[in-house]
Amino acid sequence: MNTSMSWIKMYVPDLDVTAQEYTDAMTLSGTKVEGFEKLDADLDKIVIGQIEKIEKHPDADKLIICQVNIGTETVQIVTGAPNVKEGDKVPVVLDGGRVAGGHDGQKTPGGIKIKKGKLRGVESFGMMCSIEELGSTREMYPEAPEYGIYIFTEDAVVGESAIKALGLDDVVIEYEITSNRVDCYGVLGIAREAAATFDKKFVPPVIKETGNDEKASDYVKVTVEDPELCPRYTARVVKNVKIGPSPKWMQRCLASNGIRPINNLAVSYTHLTLPTKRIV
């Protein structure tokens, strides 16, 4: 059973502890924690930058020189990425910062430190990052290109933390839930336990019923053949469903829990199921 700290804090907003403090206290309270992973452990000094100008490298056909606005200044970065253009907003690791690994997705313990240098005689003061260099994968971020730099949407704010914008400023907690604690099989159960452990207020999700005066029975019939095994089974009808991408916040929520976001229907189903561990 895995949950992210950000998801727990959705239901316990006043929870303000470190991952280690959380792990120790939850284990002592009876909800054993096997361990935790900080998604940004090997990431540092990575901001959102916007490419303002691109020029060809004078001595290398496959390299380009980019002038990148990082909010406080404009820095020059040399790259061989084939997918960037002027106006793109990209993750930029600054001089002295760290990335988790290389383009191949292999993580380096402690990360890779980025220093300013020269590429074929032209100075470069940082590096633009692929999603793999940030320690994640295209499975978790399906909008990322197969080869090249990750491109943010137009609403990304230049100068802000790229780590936070991607939801990588999070901690994934791994629990060992025993069979006598079925109440903790879902995120809501874990959140209730955390609220009790740290003496914080538990804020349950607010569920608003939407729809119209139409009845589901006009479209589908539900028959419970064995009420003892299944005392209740209900159905709702959802019409005009269009398959497409799910909202970014929902994608990030699932990705931080190690679940690949597929489309709006699959992601919505999973996001409804995980808190209660009840089949929807």
Where are each of the predicted segments found?
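Short active-site oxyanion
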Residues: 75, 258-261
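Residues forming anionic-ligand binding surfaces in small-molecule and nucleic-acid pockets
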Residues: 161-176, 218-256
